[in-house]
Design a protein with these regions (language model features):
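Glycine-enriched, solvent-exposed interface loops adjoining structured elements
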Residues: 1-224
Length: 224
């Protein structure tokens, strides 16, 4: 795991006088937003077997993370469909009283999910989920930190630079970093889906030593 604090030194030159703790807070927030938008932090959970009569299960995920979205779930080799709480109660009003072969799932919380109908036996469940850090986490998966370092830094900078009435406030630069962050998140989303990237890369973050106002006008719109 990589700590958010390890990235602080890469942000400080662009936000003079900003406390380390505030930088770390916004690095965490940027990482969460990136994971939500891109769904790039994917975990294939270890398969597990259902228990007869039990419909609620915990996601088996790393400490300091929570499930943003279930990407795939199968029961006994058959794909299951997601369902909303309202649809569950409307379409299966007595589901708690019946057992059978589960064919829908409901993400109840960031750490738990239901499968319906209530399992009548022990069958294998396989799930793939998109994760994100919790609001209290201090670390992020090293692969995500390394592969999407630019995105995380862009995201933290656009958040910090828009804070009003600070020595480092720069609304124009904030907007530019927000633009770059969106491009990185879109690229990561397409890559996670296995699709054609189709997004032209423009200016890349190059680390410490760049002047704060490093972009001119972007000119042409990016084609997605």
């Amino acid at each position: 795991m990589a700590s958010f604090s390890s990235l602080v030194k890469e942000i400080l030159p662009y936000v003079p006088m900003c406390p380390d703790s505030l930088v770390e807070q916004h690095l965490r927030a940027a990482t969460i937003e990136f994971c939500e938008r891109s769904k790039a932090y994917i975990l294939d959970m270890d398969p597990f077997n259902t228990i007869s009569g039990v419909y609620e299960y915990d996601f088996d995920i790393p400490v300091g993370t929570e499930v943003h979205q279930v990407l795939l779930m199968t029961h006994d080799g058959n794909d299951m469909d997601p369902i909303s709480p309202r649809s569950l109660e409307l379409n299966y009003p007595d589901w708690r009283d019946k057992t059978g072969q589960p064919h829908v799932y409901l993400q109840k919380t960031p750490t738990t999910f239901w499968i319906v109908p209530v399992p009548s036996g022990s069958k294998q469940v396989i799930a793939s989920v998109a994760l994100k850090p919790t609001r209290t986490s201090n670390n992020i998966d090293t692969t995500i930190s390394n592969q999407y370092r630019d995105a995380i830094i862009y995201g933290a900078l656009y958040r910090l630079l828009r804070i009003p009435n600070k020595e480092w406030t720069d609304i124009g630069a904030s907007q530019e970093y927000s633009f770059q962050f969106s491009i990185e998140a879109k690229q990561a989303e397409l890559r996670a889906r296995g699709g054609d990237l189709g997004v032209k890369r423009t200016v890349k973050y190059k680390g410490i030593g760049m002047p704060r106002r490093r972009y001119g006008r972007y000119g042409k719109e990016i084609d997605y």
